[in-house]
Design a protein with these regions (language model features):
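Positively charged n-region of N-terminal signal peptides that target proteins for export
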Residues: 1-4
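Hydrophobic alpha-helical membrane-insertion segments, chiefly the h-region
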Residues: 12-22
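Short active-site oxyanion
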Residues: 42-43, 66-68, 98-101
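Local sequence-structure signature of Cys/Sec-based thiol-disulfide redox active-site neighborhoods
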Residues: 36-64
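Thiol/selenol-based redox catalytic cores and closely related redox-interacting motifs
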Residues: 82, 88-160
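Stable alpha-helical elements in mature extracytoplasmic
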Residues: 50, 57, 72-75, 107-111
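Ser/Thr/Pro/Gly-rich low-complexity linker/stalk segments immediately outside membranes or between
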Residues: 24-40
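Conserved helix-turn-beta segment immediately C-terminal to the redox Cys motif
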Residues: 58-78
Length: 160
């Protein structure tokens, strides 16, 4: 009887040890954070030095899974024109994301859609500094009209 009990306890102990060794002990949040860091889309933002809404927008993008680098640029408007942004479409900063030009405070879900759809355009813009756009407001509210631009001209990309 003692041999059977010892054998049973030995098998149970070995099973528990094996389960411990093969179990992933990372917490779900650390696994998710690690995956998000590996998949973060890099974004470079050129902005007028000291622009507070650009800082808030960069933080907004970071909070939505993008890896953001901000560059102070006294000539970001000239850079915007050189990048193909229409004169009436120049926002408060210029960003390069996934091979696209993004001008202004474009919501992250519209950028994500752009990167998923991969249309044959140069980029998108949210002209001006709408009070309900990310970077100006605590969160996007209401409708924002985002335009696409490229060799075929300018058109509405999104009304969200």
């Amino acid at each position: 009887m003692k041999k059977i009990l010892a054998l049973t306890l030995g098998v149970a102990g070995a099973g528990a040890a094996a389960a411990y060794l093969v179990t992933d002990r990372d917490t779900p949040s650390s696994v998710i954070a690690s995956a998000a860091a590996q998949e973060a889309e890099p974004v470079t933002i050129w902005r007028a030095p000291g622009c507070g809404c650009c800082d808030a927008y960069a933080e907004y993008l970071r909070n939505n899974g993008f890896k953001v680098e901000v560059i102070d640029d006294h000539n970001f408007e000239d850079r915007s024109v050189e990048a193909g942004v229409p004169d009436r479409g120049i926002g408060c900063h210029l960003a390069m994301i996934g091979g696209y030009v993004v001008s202004g405070l474009v919501p992250s879900e519209i950028i994500e859609r752009l990167l998923e759809e991969r249309p044959e355009i140069t980029g998108i813009t949210l002209p001006g500094m709408p009070a309900n756009a990310p970077g100006m407001a605590a969160e996007k509210s209401g409708t924002l009209r985002v335009y696409s631009f490229g060799p075929d001209g300018v058109g509405v990309y999104s009304d969200e």
